[in-house]
Regions:
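Rossmann-fold scaffold of SDR-type NAD(P)-dependent oxidoreductases
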Residues: 9, 77-85, 106, 130, ...
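Conserved glycine-rich cofactor-binding loop
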Residues: 12-13
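Conserved glycine-rich Rossmann-like NAD(P)H-binding loop of the short-chain dehydrogenase/reductase
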Residues: 28-42
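Amphipathic alpha-helical dimer-interface segment in Rossmann-like NAD(P)H-dependent oxidoreductases
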Residues: 69, 73, 105-125, 162
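Conserved mid-core segment of classical short-chain dehydrogenase/reductases
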Residues: 86-99, 142-145, 184
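Active-site helix of classical SDR
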Residues: 114, 149-150
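Residue(s) in the substrate-gating loop at a strand-loop-helix junction
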Residues: 133
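C-terminal helical subdomain
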Residues: 173, 193-229
Length: 229
């Protein structure tokens, strides 16, 4: 029997890691695309079965294409979860060209991975899950560039929905609020450890996401907004 595969980007830490861990426990084969070789090696050791890691940059078109074609040879690609992201929190006058390029990596990777998965699947029988942020729904002080990239991801997600309406390609937008993960480690000037400790547990968020994308054969949950208490 052909194995069902969930591809995820950015699955080595935080919410991505929790999705990997829980999805394996639910019987899926996971293929993780991420750039951190050291973290990937730890996951290779931790998940010795039903898991395969691909180390590389999801903004590299050749890496994405080669990886997804290799994955297609392993079984049935059923889900694509775009979870990778980078953030930069500064005052509006402080952003640089490098900040823009770094922040846009998530959007570029989302587009490249989705495009290649759609090609391999011949635009059929694929569920695309784009994990963004509540910042994709509103503007936040101190998050001008982050909001801009998330609004771009949301625009791409909504356009995909229209493009594949009435087909077997389903598109889900996920909009979680702040989570207590290492995402904030490089932005402690913006969010302190004390503050992030009050944010949502990524384990709970991963459970909500997987419950909604895996459990219902007769319906599709189009959008999920997850707010912290």
């Amino acid at each position: 029997m052909e194995k069902d595969i969930l591809i995820i980007t950015g699955g080595c830490s935080g919410l991505g890691f929790e999705i990997v861990r829980q999805a394996i426990a639910r019987g899926l084969f996971i293929c993780n695309l991420a750039r951190n070789k050291e973290k990937m090696e730890k996951l290779d050791s931790l998940f010795q079965s039903n898991y395969k890691g691909f180390v590389g940059d999801i903004t590299d078109e050749k890496f994405v294409s080669d990886s997804i074609h290799q994955i297609a040879a392993l079984g049935n690609i059923k889900y694509l979860v775009n979870c990778a992201e980078k953030a930069c929190f500064k005052k509006p006058v402080e952003y640089t060209s490098e900040d823009v390029n770094t922040s846009l990596a998530g959007l570029k990777g989302m587009v490249l991975c989705t495009t290649e998965a759609l090609k391999v699947k011949e635009e059929s029988n694929l569920k695309i899950v784009n994990i963004m942020s509540s910042a994709a729904l509103k503007g936040n002080k101190g998050e001008a560039l982050y909001c801009a990239t998330k609004w771009g991801e949301r625009g791409y997600t909504e356009s995909l929905k229209e493009a594949y309406k009435g087909t077997t390609v389903k598109v889900i937008g996920i909009y979680p609020g702040g989570m207590n993960t290492e995402f904030w480690d490089e932005s402690r000037h913006y969010v302190t450890e004390e503050k992030s400790s009050t944010f949502m547990n990524p384990k709970d968020v991963a459970t909500v996401i997987l419950d909604n994308i895996l459990n219902y054969s007769s319906l599709n949950v189009a959008d999920i907004k997850i707010e912290r208490n």
